[in-house]
Amino acid sequence: MKRLNDEQRSPREPHESIALNPGDLATFYARVSEMSGRDRTLDLSTIRIGERLLDDPVAAISPGGAAPGELILVCDGTEILRDQEAVKPMVVAALQAAGTDCTVITLAASDGHELHTTPDQIATVREHLRVDVAVVVLGSGTVTDVTKHAVYEFERETGNRLSLTVIQTANSVCAFTSGLAVVTTGGVKRTVPSRLPDRLA
């Protein structure tokens, strides 16, 4: 095997790091696109971070701060507490107080034990989706994968894009910032193309 000496090797370009400011994704996308020579903009346009974020869920859902008229909120039955208050009913109450017509879909495990991203769960969410209805996920990576894939299928079938916001209740799960979903079919997990959220909180 022929080996190249140091003089024959192509010089490596110096790597330039890019700081990611979650509050300014537009600048990050523009810088990455400039460096790579192609558009790298993703559908995820907003990331909101804050200890009291849930005090105003409308701000997380709507960039302009106006409450959507009709909204579907998808969650599971797992109780999440903040300051001894149940988070999911608190968010629903805040959305309703802002004038939003909020339909809550609570996913339940078919075997009574653990929720999985299955075609049946995806279909449960899919049948509630309609044009011009905002969709919000409040929960874990599994609920997020179920919902974003239901939205993905709806958009492919109808050609209509829906607003999708994820309010995460787990610290670090790929589902929140991935354009893929892990779907369990016949007991086998498969990673399939799906959809990024528009906003993450």
Summary of predicted features, one role per range:
Residues V87-V92, V143-R161:
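Short Gly/Thr/Asp-enriched flexible loops that form oxyanion-binding sites at enzyme active sites
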Residues K2-A134:
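ATP/NTP phosphate-donor binding region
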Residues E79, V143, S172:
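Surface-exposed, flexible loop/turn segments at secondary-structure boundaries
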Residues V131-H149:
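Extended, charge-rich low-complexity interaction segments
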Residues S45, Y152-A201:
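A glycine/threonine-rich phosphate-anchoring loop and its flanking beta-alpha core
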Residues P57, T147-K148, G179:
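Short hydrophobic alpha-helical segments that form membrane-spanning helices or hydrophobic packing faces
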Residues V74-C75, G139, Q168:
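Short beta-strand/turn micro-motifs composed of small residues
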